[in-house]
Amino acid sequence: MHSKDREPVIIQSCRTPIGKFLGALSSLSAPDLGALVVENLIERAGVEPQYLDEVIMGNVVGTGVGQAPARQASVRGGVPESVPALTINKVCGSGLKAVMLAAQAIRAGDANLILAGGMESMSNAPFYIRGMRNGLKFGNANLEDALLSDGLWCAFGHCHMGTHAEYTARKGGVTRRDADEFSLRSHNLAIKALSEGRFAEEIISVSSKNGREKVVVDFDEGPRKDTSMNTLEKLKPAFPEASGKYQDELTITAGNAAGLNDGAAGVIVASRGFARAHGLEIEAKITNYVASGLEPRDLFFAPVKAVNDLMTKEKTQISDYDLVELNEAFAVQALADIRGLKIDIAVSYTHLTLPTIYSV
């Protein structure tokens, strides 16, 4: 096959709405949400599911989800049992890593068609008790939150990830006002984009339960029309325990950081040769990718290193790009990385930033 035929391309993409913590999507597990994405991707793309070489899905808080979450989503989504599935846990980068693995397999000639994405239900993360396997002989037992221990707690720094975000703010020179202004701009852009229907095509409708009632959810629950600078300025710091490390004003609040959410998203990645042979419309091509790592407390600066490494591979510079999408959980991180990469914010965030769509 000609090398151009091995180029990975995206032929279809979709996502569920982003549900608030304990909100409209909380009755569905992560594999349930993933299955809806799998089913809709196959239907939208118009491909026979037996042509899939693999399903790769990211999932972080796997406690209580059940064995092989990606396999659950795949089979429930209508993919034949003969198609293998792989679950990826790279914390926040899990879903994107799934897409990278799909592209790599296709470029290597190991596959022609892969469904890749991510799924999470933070609302359904359980509590558990350590030590009960051997039996508790004396004293109290404490419940631990799997959402915190498996997803939001740094195993190296032994602190909330938000504490590392506070460190990022200081190292990156980002103030509380900077973060609030950035968050407000993001909210306004998101509300505008939603009102103009810019996300309508990518969002699939989800049937869920609200108590005994069945509801259909087709909108993101995060963005708030009533957000104002006055409201954001009144919010208390989200990680007061960080005050022991940082004596000046704390920066992270519920208004300038991502919330806890439920949702799933995915793409179908094909080789260009397969797409052409089957008459499939191409949405985008995947030209390159880079993964990067830093010291744990510096993790929020990793995108700067990754993007610089990517541009070195591509022999480009940041000014060559007309649009940059930087998906980060904290406004302070987004700002620190924007400054670190010298990105023109006017061409970077046309609709929203991620803290908005996932906001509380």
Per-segment meaning from a language model:
Residues 14-16, 27-36, 44, 178-272, ...:
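N-terminal extracellular/periplasmic Venus flytrap/periplasmic-binding protein-like
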Residues 113-167:
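Flexible glycine-/small-residue-enriched beta->alpha junction loops
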Residues 272-320:
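Glycine- and Gly-Pro-enriched alpha-helical subdomains that act as flexible
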Residues 66, 85-94, 260, 325-327, ...:
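Active-site nucleophile and cofactor-binding loops and adjacent substrate-binding regions
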Residues 351-360:
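Single conserved hydrophobic/aromatic residue that forms the stacking wall/gate
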Residues 31-45, 69-73, 98-101, 162-168, ...:
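Short, well-ordered amphipathic alpha-helical segments that serve as non-catalytic structural scaffolds
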Residues 88-120, 163, 169-198, 266-273, ...:
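Active-site-proximal alpha-helical scaffold in enzymes
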Residues 41-51, 172, 276-279, 310-322, ...:
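Phosphate/pyrophosphate-binding loops at sites that engage ATP/ADP/AMP, CoA/4′-phosphopantetheine
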